UniProtKB/Swiss-Prot annotation:
Any GO BP annotation: maturation of SSU-rRNA
Name listed for the protein in its UniProt record: Ribosome-binding factor A
Species in which this protein is naturally found: Sodalis glossinidius (strain morsitans)
GO molecular function list: ribosomal small subunit binding
Keyword Cytoplasm applies: yes
Gene name of the encoded protein: rbfA
Length: 138
């Protein structure tokens, strides 16, 4: 029977916390900006880790690419600091990827809000009372 909460999940969760602290306190590169670690996926053998990040201030594709490139350039430095912070025999090799789920979630939320607003406007523009509906059904 498989464990409900595996070691890789625990390591990924701890890595997410530690990398977030490192990005906040140690990385001074202005290209990174306001980076947030949204998730970490660790391979089963703990050799590789994919770190998903979002950038709060950067909206353009070029800014995002620059930020991810800067993080990838700093991966060795982050790896060494992570090794000092965590008690692992082998610290996973880090790769950084942009997580667009926050942007997609905001886009979907805006679409839903637009539909609700359009529906309210349509209902207020053409009031139909109950007697009109009954006449149409007959």
């Amino acid at each position: 029977m498989a464990k409900e909460y595996s070691r890789t999940q625990r390591v990924a969760q701890e890595m997410q916390k530690e990398i977030a602290i490192i990005l906040q306190r140690e990385i001074k590169d202005p290209r990174v900006g306001m980076a947030t670690v949204s998730g970490v996926e660790v391979s089963r053998d703990l050799a590789y880790a994919k770190v998903f990040v979002t950038f709060l201030n950067d909206n353009t594709l070029e800014q995002v690419k620059t930020g991810v490139r800067a993080l990838q350039d700093a991966a060795g430095f982050i790896h060494s600091l992570l090794g000092k912070a965590m008690r692992l025999r082998v610290v996973p090799e880090l790769t950084f990827a942009y997580d667009n789920s926050l942007v997609e979630g905001m886009r979907m939320s805006n679409l839903v809000s637009q539909v609700v607003q359009n529906d309210r406007l349509r209902r207020s523009a053409s009031p139909v009372d109950k007697t009109d509906r009954e006449d149409k059904e007959d």
